[in-house]
Amino acid sequence: MADFTRIPLWLIGTIVGILVIGLIGIYFYGSYSGLGSSL
């Protein structure tokens, strides 16, 4: 990983939050659409 001292913590938190919400959303959407079983 790069030097985290140059990256604001709020930026890291925002990116991680978006990724987590996106993964959860895709997971539930896939399960709702019947594609979750293939994952």
Swiss-Prot record:
Pfam families: PsbJ (PF01788)
Localization in the cell: Plastid, Chloroplast thylakoid membrane
Membrane topology designation: Single-pass membrane protein
Coiled coil: none
Keyword Thylakoid: yes
Keywords carried by this UniProt record: Chloroplast, Membrane, Photosynthesis, Photosystem II, Plastid, Reaction center, Thylakoid, Transmembrane, Transmembrane helix
SUPFAM superfamilies xref list: Photosystem II reaction center protein J, PsbJ
The family this protein is said to belong to: Belongs to the PsbJ family.
Record text on subunit structure and interactions: PSII is composed of 1 copy each of membrane proteins PsbA, PsbB, PsbC, PsbD, PsbE, PsbF, PsbH, PsbI, PsbJ, PsbK, PsbL, PsbM, PsbT, PsbX, PsbY, PsbZ, Psb30/Ycf12, at least 3 peripheral proteins of the oxygen-evolving complex and a large number of cofactors. It forms dimeric complexes.
Protein name: Photosystem II reaction center protein J
UniProt gene name: psbJ
